[in-house]
UniProtKB/Swiss-Prot annotation:
GO terms assigned for molecular function: carbohydrate binding
Identification of the protein by name: Asialoglycoprotein receptor 2
Topology with respect to the bilayer: Single-pass type II membrane protein
UniProt note on tissues of expression: Expressed exclusively in hepatic parenchymal cells.
InterPro entries: C-type_lectin-like, C-type_lectin-like/link_sf, C-type_lectin/snaclec_domain, C-type_lectin_CS, CD209-like_CTLD, CTDL_fold
Region annotation (Disordered) ranges: 1-43
Disulfide bond positions: C170-C181, C198-C293, C271-C285
Side of membrane Cytoplasmic, spans: 1-58
Domain C-type lectin: 169-295
Topological domain ranges for the Extracellular compartment: 80-301
Amino acid sequence: MEKDCQDIQQLDSEENDHQLSGDDEHGSHVQDPRIENPHWKGQPLSRPFPQRLCSTFRLSLLALAFNILLLVVICVVSSQSIQLQEEFRTLKETFSNFSSSTLMEFGALDTLGGSTNAILTSWLAQLEEKQQQLKADHSTLLFHLKHFPMDLRTLTCQLAYFQSNGTECCPVNWVEFGGSCYWFSRDGLTWAEADQYCQLENAHLLVINSREEQDFVVKHRSQFHIWIGLTDRDGSWKWVDGTDYRSNYRNWAFTQPDNWQGHEQGGGEDCAEILSDGHWNDNFCQQVNRWVCEKRRNITH
């Protein structure tokens, strides 16, 4: 195509040369203004038609080539865009499926976790209940083990008492200690009434001979004042069984005995009692207190 344009331009040049030579031969008076006046500013001479045609054809070819190239680029970009859209759609579906699957798994784990927590809570509650029950059973067992020797001794003593018709061991509901039997009342009497009650049981009001006996009585008498077999009605303190007062064990509270005279009934304090703290006190004999009877354990062979 370019060669054709060159041929056309060559033919056009030859034709121009021929015309110029013809003009010279005929002595034409037509002069080229550009030759006569080098400063001529008129319109440029128009290019011949074949040259203009060749330039337009080149531009058309360039435009066509550019359009083809642009079309190819558009096709390539469109193809890649479609491929990217397809890949994005596939990726989106994959991510959506993954998200749904993950959410389902999390939901299953949450449900399983809730069930597990409920089961663990139930087990912990049952375990705590069993633990409390075991503690209670353990405390009960310790209590029975602690009192088992005493209970066994009491049962053995009661059995021996019945077998020997009351000639051996302590009577029923009496407690043995140090070779003596003790009975602790559950109601109250005056000192004289309590002393008479003990005599009817072939016993006497409590006579304390040692610190050990004092501790034993305090341990079993609860938190009540109790009468003991000690009185000074005749002006001096004496034990009801004849035990010597001066040489025997004593546990008076501070400032006691004081023979206080302020009772409404009149008279002083001539009868001894054990206070709630274990110390002794002289009190008005008509006061109503609990009491303890004591007698020697009978042993016959």
